[in-house]
Structure formats: C-alpha cells, structure tokens
Amino acid sequence: MKAESSNESFIIGQRVHSLNDSRRVGTVKYVGDVEGYSGTWIGVDWDQDGDGKHNGSVNGVFYFNGRSQSSASFVRSQNLSRGITLLQALELRYRTISTKDEEDEMYVLSAGNRRVSIQLLGGDKIQDKLSRFEELTSASLSYLGVSSLGVSSDLGSILPNLKLLDLTGNLISDWEEIGALCEQLPALTTLNLSCNSLSSDIKSLPQLKNIRVLVLNNSGLSWTQVEILRRSLPGIEELHLMGNMISTITSTSSSDDQAFNSLRLLNLDDNCISDWSEVLKLSQLPCLEQLYLNKNKLSRIFQSVNGTESSEKGSDPFPSLSCLLLGANNIGDLASVDALNGFPQLVDIRLSENPISDPVRGGVPRFVLVARLTKVQVLNGSEVRAREKKDSEIRYVRMVMSKLNDKSGEIELLHPRFYELKKLHGIEDERASAENSGPKNIASGLISITLKCVGPSMGEKPHLTKKLPGSITVGKLKILSENFFKLKSIKPRLFLQEEGSPFPTALDDETATLLDVGICDGSTLLVDEES
C-alpha cells in the first residue's frame, strides 16, 4: 500500500513527503504560481538540507523562507503525499509480504537514536503472529508517512496489548492527535515521536497517565513547550529531548506544582546549553538518576549561584543523581571536576572529549580525574575498580608533593582532596633534607616501572622492569630507553598506559619528572617512535 496524492489543495504548514520516498519529509511553505512556469506549484521546505534546490527564491523572486540554501524546492501536487493513517501503516508494515530489502530496513529506533534491528526468525510463523494486531506488544512504523489516526478508528480493540510504539520520522504534528492516540491505547507506555515536526501550540492535551517513556528527539521543541507537556505526564520516568536546540530551561509552573516528580532519566544530548545555571534549575528533581548533557556548550560546573533558584536552602543539589554524562562539551578547569563531588549519589561520570580530559589540549590524565572524584565508579564508560582508585590516588598525591612547596593554603585551594588522600594512604613527606639524603633515602625514592617497546621499526624486544628515581625527567628516561633497548637512529616517544583508559597518554614534556606526570610504582610505559 503506497500513499497516494489527490487533487485536494495543500495548505501552508502541512507536513508532506515525496510520493516516491517516504523518508524525504518536509513542510508546505507556499502554494501558488511560480513566475515563468505554468500551473500551481507547492513550495516545500525539506527537513534535510540538500533535499531541495534553493532557499525559497527562484530567478530572483522570493516566495518563502527556506531553512538553508538547499532545503527548498517547488513540486507538483501529484508528486507529494499527505501521508496515511496509523492503521494503514500497520497493514503496510505487518500484513504485507516483505522483500529482503524491506526486512533489512525493519528496526526499532532506540531513545539514543540507534537502530535496533528486528530479526524475522521463523518466517511465516512470526509473520502470522504479527498480522494478528491484538498480539502486538511493540510496533515500529518509522518513516511510513503516518499523518493521522484515521476516521472512526478504534485502536484500543485493535491493539489492546501494544506497549511500545515507534513513530519516528512521520508526518505527525498535531498534539490533539497524539493525545487521542495515547488515550485509545490503554497498554501504551513508550512512545517515540522523534523527527516529527511537532506543533508549538500545545493545548487540550489529556492526562497521559500511562506514558512512562517519551522520546521527542529532533522535534523542534523548546523547554517552554516541555513545561506545558509535563502537566499531562504525571507518571513520566524517561524523557528524551536530543537535538532540539534547547539553550535555556525556563519554568512556566507555579511553585505549588510538582513537576516531573517521577522523572528518572532526562536526555538533553546534542543541544545548545552553555550556562550551568540552566542545568541547576533541574537540581531539585527528587527522583532524577540519569542526566545526559553530551554535545552541549558547557564550559564550567559549579554548585549554586548565591541563592539562585538552582537549589533550595538546606538541600543537596540533584539528591538522586547517580549518572551524569558531559562528553563533548568545553569543560577545561579542575574546579569544575571538583564541583561534581557535591552531588551526593554521583558515581557514573563522562568527561571525554572535553579539554580537561585531553592532555594534548592542556588537560589531565585519567588518574588525576579518578583521584579528584570522590565517589566515581565509572569514568568515561570504563569501570573504576578498587585497585585503579587506590593507585590513582597515590600517584596523584605523589605528583602534588613533587610540584608544590609546603604551603597548606595553596595546596588546599588547588588540590582539595590532597590532605584527605595523603592521610588515607599513609603517605609520608618525601622531600630529602640535608641530614637524611643518604643512600637509604635515595633507595626508598625509587619507583618500579615497566617499559614496553611498541614501535614498528624496533623489532620484538622483551619488556624491561627498572627501578628509577621519581625525580628523573622524561627527557632523561628517553635517553635511558635508547640505551636499554639499543635503539639506533630511532628517536623514542614515551606514553603512559593507564588502567581503564582506552588510549595511552603521551609524555611530551621532556623537562617534567616522572612524579610530575603521575608515574608511580608499577606504572607501564610504552616506548614508541617519533612519526
């Protein structure tokens, strides 16, 4: 069953797709004549840049504003589809015989915009089961051109057991239609409306008491609309809002309202939030356990701003938050890392693709982050085991001791956990004085490191374990490595291999000591060659 066009007039704002490609979706922006061409034309602004030919102007004549220079085009009405009903889409997806290509395209889109394939094992038996709609518990109708429920549809009796419905990339825009859909499906708990251009006018929306997971990625929503929506979502537990260009989190609710009291996961990945004060407006959500803020524009984290609405007096911010994902932002200071210790339950943190976690951009190695984060159990997706935690804290303390003079105020300001960790691990001051700088003291300052040759031109060489003073420089160790491994005409480059880190850390500062860069007893260094 293919959606067909008709001779009915198209209207401004209507969602349509190309008759021959249901994935080519757009919005009608103009209906009328085009100078130099006969007949009536439909001006469409396509969702994907490049699907059009211009920006809404032709031969110097302006007709409508396109989103970009290549998002707009003029199309004859017979080449556009207004879409099909939900029941027609169900028939198309589950009651027609699928070709191999169509089966390859059958998938459910996860909340994180990843495809989860549906494998049709058992062939005819599964096809027979799927064709009995009353047995369906999940349905993927993505990119089928669904635009409405249809006239006099009784979805409740047709789909009594449907719990998950994926309507990604369709033509739905009317919130009243969405409300009616949820009311008619009594078992529905998960609804994915990603990549539908949803109306900014949200009114007459009923209470969607059964919806637990709502996915609205790339749907053009502002936070003001989210605040209106939340009044109809008393039981919502997961809300996904990726790619909506949200930059501010405003509140339209009164102080008496209990907004999102059951919300456990909020996904704000790939938005435009740059000020941590906006994030702090979420800090009193009582059940929020997971907050995703990857790919935003955050540069700094702090606890509160002089009694702002970020937190109520006497209460901890984010009291239930255990997972905070901040990958691919602009965070570059250690004070922001330290601020995360103020979240009482936070154990899973992502800081990858930030300047602070990239030593090449002036950041710090993984062990420093592990040591400074009091409760961390998972960092950048890798588990922090007890051994790594202990080793990182000891390395960190020794690194600080090698760098700073004994100025307690300065140390406490720059390294808030230093004295706590020094006491925890029983680390004594190791600065040599005139009377205790003899051979015994020098021996006690030696650290055992393992060197591994990995350069492609170095050949196979056995690993070496050496005891060296922590005070020697990286440059000196490079020279020693040349001697240890008899490297002729090869300039070595050293890397520190850290547990839990997917990539080794380059040691390029030749004046830094081993203690400066966090090398301690048991560390492994890779000896590579300069490219």
Swiss-Prot record:
Supercomplex made of cofactors A to E. Cofactors A and D function by capturing and stabilizing tubulin in a quasi-native conformation. Cofactor E binds to the cofactor D-tubulin complex; interaction with cofactor C then causes the release of tubulin polypeptides that are committed to the native state. CDD domains: Ubl_TBCE. LRR repeats lie at residues 84-109, 159-183, 185-213, 233-256, 260-284, 285-308, 318-342, 344-366, 474-497. The lineage of its organism: Eukaryota, Viridiplantae, Streptophyta, Embryophyta, Tracheophyta. SUPFAM superfamilies: Cap-Gly domain, L domain-like, Ubiquitin-like. This is Tubulin-folding cofactor E. Keywords: Chaperone, Cytoplasm, Leucine-rich repeat, Repeat. The keyword Cytoplasm applies. It comes from Arabidopsis thaliana. Disruption phenotype: Embryo lethality. Embryo development limited to the formation of a few giant cells lacking microtubules but not actin filaments. Failure to localize KNOLLE in mitotic cells.
